[in-house]
Amino acid sequence: MQDLSLEARLAELESRLAFQEITIEELNVTVAAHEMEMAKLRDHLRLLTEKLKASQPSNIASQAEETPPPHY
């Protein structure tokens, strides 16, 4: 009777392991897809930031245009 119980427990553990392996593989695929999407979004954000900077003049004068402080 104990052998049957051990066999049943072993079968249950093997079943759980197989399920976990499938789940891990599915999660791996999902994470890889998210990484690709985030890379695309970073590229788009960089391009939009560059376009925004190019289209709007800055209100801050460059250091060469700034007058020196009064103590100079």
Swiss-Prot record:
Residues 53-72 are annotated as: Disordered. Residues 55-65 have a biased composition (Polar residues). InterPro entries: SlyX. It comes from the Bacteria. It holds the Pfam family SlyX. Belongs to the SlyX family. This is Protein SlyX. The gene is slyX.
